[in-house]
Each structure stands twice: as C-alpha cells, then as structure tokens.
Amino acid sequence: APTPEGMEFVIMLAFGLPKGELNRPAEKAHRESMERLCVYKQEPLRETQELIEAARLAPSSLNSQPWKFVVYRNRLHIFEVQKRQGGKRSAWQEINMGIMMAHILMAAEEYWIDVTMTHSDNLAEKPVANYRYVGSVLVKP
C-alpha cells in the first residue's frame, strides 16, 4: 500500500501466532528483569503486573529496552531512558517507546483490563537525571 504523501515507510511489526516454530524461544530473548525495569512504590494489582510484563517483553531496536517504570498499586508511570549514541538521541527511541506502549494497550485488551493512558504535567516538569517522563497508565479496578 502506498504511504501518505510526505511520509516514508520506517518499520513493520507482525502480530499473531507463527505458522511454524519461532526462530527463538521467548525465554532466550534477553529481556531486562522486573527488578531492573521497575521501581515499586506499592504492591501492584495483578492487572498492573500483567501490563508491565507485556511491556517488558516488547521488542526494541538492538534490544535496547529504553524504558523504566515507577509502579503503584493501580498505576504505572513510564519513563524513557535517555541513552545517547555518539552524543545524540537514537533515531529509534520514539518507535521503541511506541511499540512498548502498544504492547501495554494490546495486553489490556487481551486480558480485559480497563485502562486509561494519561500524561501528568507535574511529572513531566520534574527533572530526573537520564530519564524523560512519557506518560502514565491507570488501571481501573
């Protein structure tokens, strides 16, 4: 399909079950542990934990996984790790973050979890070294 005028094709991501065997089992994907990805402020609801796991398993360019989470019972604040490659931001950062956030939303739909994605100006204005606040996910109990 042609792309809209002024836009160019950048990336494609397939969803669904494979016809044959996967080229790599999920356990060999070398994803960061929950302990490295999350700062737990409260014990999360099971639903909140399901969404974090979906985000943790999201693919990223060069397996960079440029995200961190601050976790509460029914909410999760998403931060982008500000990694620099040669002094400038990776061109793939926004795509990586978008894929991860799409994984959260797809998991919410799959598991029938009612969520709202929000943005907190207060969090966005707080400087956190090497991190940029992206948004928050609220889980409705």
Where is each model-derived feature located?
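Acidic, surface-exposed loops and disordered segments
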Residues: 1-141
